[in-house]
Amino acid sequence: MFTDRNEAGKLLSEKLADLKGENCLVLAIPRGGVVIGNQIALSLGCKLDVVISKKINPPNHPEYAIGAIMPDGTVHWNQDMSQYLEHAYFVNEINEKKNEAQRQLEQFRGNSRYDLKDKTVILTDDGIATGATVFVILKWLAKNNPKKIVVASPVIPASTYEQLKKTSDQVIALLLPTEFYAVSEFYKKFDQVSEKEVESILKNFR
């Protein structure tokens, strides 16, 4: 169990030490992932940026992700959803989540231009559950020609870890639980990270 995100980020950065000196960029998923990414970027001496994806939820289950979407409309589904996509609920949910992703991208970055060519991209979050928000970013990253994609997170369920290994060059985790309920159970302190804190951290890398 980790004390908080800062401790988890420092411990994770030790596992990434061999990437120091490479042309690296840390891409963090807000908001908790930015605290982790800050520690990694400081340790490796590289830039920190954000990448936005939003969970798509089924009716009445706000915590359960069946997929995820990015500001440009890139979508990943955890299961075959083709028969449901024209239902009014999902049309509305997809539009809402895409708009939310666009708003957050504008707030934290100001634009959607990324220069990832020939870079080693370290994609990080404070924990990965189903992996929906990460898988959609991996799909998007593949179109942007990075040299290498490393997924790094303090905690990833063993089953998700095996799936991630198929879609990235390297996956680094400190904990690989076989039983997993929520990311928060692996932290003593898991307060919500404010948008102001995210903006403050990112300002140091501009």
Each PLM stretch: what is its role?
Residues M1-R206:
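PRPP-associated nucleotide enzymes
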